[in-house]
């Protein structure tokens, strides 16, 4: 077993198209790159269990064996494929399960949620041994407005309010954002104030192509969303949204992360239009707002600024919940960058890995905040 699993340091998991990597000793002069684990598998998401930091669940996809949830009990060193997988009932879609996009744990660690393609939300109360369909969302009256977007039709973002776990917010591409205040018994569309320029109605109730939704860990009222048409903030748990795109070089992007201590501090990586889908002007730039999106500035020192045509995907950026100011992101070219100062200076952690699908901070001595 690698010494990282017996050490007290923190690690960054990097899920890629060809397996899972682990970067340890983040505070050392020479961080250690380990892996690949789950070699040959697409690792779309990784989530630890609160209170059991070395227990990890991963959303996995393979061209032969399909989509599964995998479990590790030793910090990612060894993995077991769980027999059960979340899927729609036969006949509802052409394929009950194409891929598993996102996993989320309730603060007490008792429930595991999964978002899948075709778009649907599922939960397990027995650590993935069995799954239940959240029918109230998956058969919502507005589902007729949902549709695939460039081949993707997934529920890709799951936010759980840590102060009120019955408050849930999810993002669907392309379906929009939905919220529940009763643990998923009932759901309301949460898209008021959000543009949908690709639809006949500019401000529809549902059907939006949302790329990412995040909730502040200390204040479930504060949400941010990256969309096909703009970046937005909500101050009331998703009931209403304010566009905060002004000051950014584009209104398109995927990756966004908020500061775990200050809900007004948010970082994001804009991309160039819905057609190019790479960094704007061939420059890898991160933008930060310190006032909830009223103003933005580039915080890109240490990042390449010439002929960089890469993509940073929706789960490929993360904020460290236990170390204020530490963020990481990975690119489609397999480069991973880290900052310890909210973007004021970036360092290269790894390069030329397979395409990065997700990054996730974890701590052996603590828990995912």
List each language-model region with its residue ranges:
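Extracellular glycan-interacting surfaces
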Residues: 1-369
């Amino acid at each position: 077993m690698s010494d990282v699993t017996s050490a007290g340091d923190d690690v960054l998991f990097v899920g890629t198209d060809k397996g899972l990597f682990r970067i340890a000793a983040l505070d050392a002069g020479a961080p250690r790159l380990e892996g690949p684990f789950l070699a040959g598998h697409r690792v779309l998401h990784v989530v630890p269990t609160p209170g059991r930091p070395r227990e990890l669940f991963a959303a996995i996809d393979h061209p032969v064996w399909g989509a599964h949830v995998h479990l590790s009990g030793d910090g990612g060193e060894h993995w077991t494929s769980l027999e059960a997988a979340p899927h729609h009932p036969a006949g509802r879609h052409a394929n009950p399960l194409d891929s598993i996009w996102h996993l989320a744990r309730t603060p007490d660690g008792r429930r595991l949620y999964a978002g899948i393609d075709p778009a649907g939300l599922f939960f397990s109360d027995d650590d993935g041994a069995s799954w239940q369909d959240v029918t109230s969302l998956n058969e919502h009256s507005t589902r007729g407005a949902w549709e695939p977007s460039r081949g993707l039709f997934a529920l890709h973002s799951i936010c759980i309010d840590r102060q009120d776990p019955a408050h849930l917010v999810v993002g669907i591409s392309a379906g929009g954002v939905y919220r529940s205040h009763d643990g998923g018994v009932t759901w309301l569309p949460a898209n008021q104030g959000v543009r949908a320029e690709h639809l006949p109605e500019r401000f529809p109730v549902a059907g939006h192509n949302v790329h990412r939704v995040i909730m502040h860990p200390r204040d479930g009222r504060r949400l941010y969303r990256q969309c096909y048409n703009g970046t937005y903030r909500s101050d009331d748990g998703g009931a209403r949204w304010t566009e905060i795109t002004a000051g950014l070089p584009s209104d398109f992007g995927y990756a966004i992360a908020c500061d775990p201590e200050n809900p007004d501090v948010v970082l994001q990586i804009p991309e160039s239009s819905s057609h190019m889908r790479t960094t704007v002007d061939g420059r890898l730039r991160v933008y930060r707002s310190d006032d909830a999106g009223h103003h933005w500035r580039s915080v890109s020192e240490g990042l390449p600024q010439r002929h960089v045509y890469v993509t940073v995907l929706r789960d490929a950026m993360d904020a460290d919940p236990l170390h204020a100011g530490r963020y990481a992101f990975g690119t489609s070219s397999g480069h991973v960058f880290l900052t310890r100062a909210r973007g004021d200076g970036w360092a290269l952690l790894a390069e030329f890995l397979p395409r990065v699908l997700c990054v996730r901070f974890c701590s052996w001595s603590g828990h995912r905040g």
